[in-house]
Amino acid sequence: MLFRSTAPYSQAVKVGNTVYLAGVCGDDPKTDKIVGNGDIKIETKYALENLKNTVEAAGGTLKDIVKVNVFVKDIKMMADFNEVYSSYFPENPPARIAMQITDLAGGANLEIDAVAVL
């Protein structure tokens, strides 16, 4: 299930064989609420499932993702984030940056955006 934003942006934009995926958080697309009560592993799993659903809706898979940007409220969360992330990208993971930011919408602890080449 894809998240339906009320904000003026697309979840994904396809240009040729490149897909630009908008940022996703660890929210349940059925309720639009952040999950996990602060548990970064649960929130990461939901965010990556949301990313997976979006890239699949665009005709790709997680293996097509070539670049990921990760935004976290606390860089110390990255060890737990990486544990979950590695299960989604076990071999040849995409290029990636991770950065700490001050705040995210809806009380999220992380947001992930990506670029895929189909």
What name fits each language-model region?
Residues 1-118:
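Short, polar/acidic, helix-capping and beta-turn segments at strand->helix junctions
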